[in-house]
């Protein structure tokens, strides 16, 4: 019976990441259709991402304290109710202001749900198995990011209005709701008491938080500007450029599945050093490659070897305390989300003043910094073990 409950809780975590992945991808995919619906330009619609990301960031930050006041089960039930309200609000939105408010609410729901999903996994599993399960959980983010564009394209091709895509998105949260009602959450009462342990921040937690921010910033800065770089600098046509980006994310998802098995047999800190080092070298090779074939195989390798880095950062942070801490997990997610928000704020001026080539080098430098941080974290842990 306990095993069945654990399976239900694990699937809640899987679906929580699937919900966030789908939400982010579909909002970008139907940007043009939303702009036409509200008679705005695509550039004017770009603030939607700000509302969505702001909602995710704020909710992750607030959930560090909210989890002490409201049980996980109640939060997920309220999340389902708010998701229904937001989706109905989107369907019946008559102005861009109402749409922005509702997308912000979905961002709040998404951030809280994703942080809960991560916390559940860290409570249910320990050691290398925790890292393995977190990788599987993270793969659902990429999986829904691949499935929902197909659903979106199918609906739009049949002239079905764009807002029905959000209705399909609601199905994921409905599944979370069903599993929540039928599950017992022992972690919600006992484990959240360990949140005070974050007050005793050690240097590794700080370094892991910085690593999360720099890694996400480096990754998104790289992959966001690769299409423009390959078309303008390398002179590759847009179709082949699209294949490069697709190959990266496909390899990223496959990598998460593979490393969820491989990670059980290796030391997490050594794996962290190996993956950040390999990814830094591969990104360097990509930047200095000129042929399409070299770019293709390099970006596939980069997607594969970088896939487990963020999850390993979360896992290592969760192992810094004797028992899982929701505040600690949310701290890493919070820094990762800041990296997402800073992507275009930092890279757009670099592109404007120094060009695309310099922007990719900037991304590579961030990866190298994370590699050095991983070495410092390993060294600190060895000292801690000897004490």
From Swiss-Prot:
Its main location: membrane. The gene is tsgA. It is a multi-pass membrane protein. Belongs to the major facilitator superfamily. TsgA family. This is Protein TsgA homolog. It is found in: Cell membrane. It holds the Pfam family MFS_1. Gene3D superfamilies: MFS general substrate transporter like domains. The keyword Cell membrane applies. GO terms for cellular component: plasma membrane. The chain crosses the membrane at residues 11-31, 47-67, 76-96, 101-121, 134-154, 160-180, 205-225, 243-263, 271-291, 299-319, 331-351, 358-378. One of its GO terms (molecular function) is transmembrane transporter activity. It comes from the Bacteria. Keywords: Cell membrane, Membrane, Transmembrane, Transmembrane helix. InterPro entries: MFS, MFS_dom, MFS_trans_sf, MFS_TsgA, MFS_TsgA-like.
